[in-house]
């Protein structure tokens, strides 16, 4: 079978050897969010502006990165566009400014911050991913979606604790950048939709075998 592993960041991920997955050339791996800190999956999926900023800021290029919000434009427009934000927002830049000939802009209203991210038009590992289900779906759902869109017919999900242990949203990276410290008390804002999205993704890709491993 054409097998893909979707690597989530729930605590149960510790039960699985990522190194074993990496050595199996018959498997394609799709990681979620900041998995890159630990393991270079074949593909890295992200849909949160702050996480995308972290990935690009660190000039991470070991995985093919799929961002649901990624619309780079030529730097010919950079000065006029960024200037329009400076009066009301703090502007923070990320990525390789010297090498990049394209840029993307992300606003983060809670802190009145605009992130300007630099990338290349040729040879970049970053690309836009358009989900089939919902823009509001979790990163894990987007990663499953991406694997299905690429034709994988057998999908195994690890570190998906909110599915295998309902109501458990603990995260391996809690307490680090972009992750809350009080993980045991945290419920994601869209958590009530996640179960629905998992059902929708299975229905949409009816011929794909999707399995969640504890």
PLM segments and residue spans:
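Metal-ion/cofactor- or nucleotide/acyl-coenzyme-handling active-site neighborhoods
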Residues: 1-214
């Amino acid at each position: 079978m054409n097998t893909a592993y979707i690597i989530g960041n729930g605590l149960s991920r510790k039960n699985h050897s990522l190194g074993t997955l990496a050595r199996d050339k018959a498997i394609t791996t799709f990681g979620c969010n900041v998995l890159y800190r630990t393991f270079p999956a074949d593909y890295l999926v992200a849909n949160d502006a702050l996480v995308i900023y972290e990935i690009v800021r660190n000039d991470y290029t070991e995985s093919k990165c799929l961002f649901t919000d990624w619309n780079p434009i030529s730097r010919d427009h950079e000065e006029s566009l960024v200037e329009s934000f400076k009066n009301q927002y703090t502007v923070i830049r990320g990525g390789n400014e010297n090498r990049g000939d394209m840029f993307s802009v992300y606003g983060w209203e809670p802190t009145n911050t605009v992130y300007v991210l630099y990338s290349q038009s040729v040879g970049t590992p970053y690309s836009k991913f358009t989900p089939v289900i919902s823009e509001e779906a979790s990163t894990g759902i987007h990663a499953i979606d991406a694997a299905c869109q690429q034709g994988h017919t057998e999908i195994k999900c690890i570190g998906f604790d909110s599915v295998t242990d309902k109501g458990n949203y603990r995260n391996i990276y809690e307490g680090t950048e972009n992750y809350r410290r009080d993980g045991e008390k945290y419920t994601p804002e869209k958590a009530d939709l996640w179960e629905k999205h998992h059902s929708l993704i299975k229905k949409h890709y009816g011929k794909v075998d999707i399995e969640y491993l504890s």
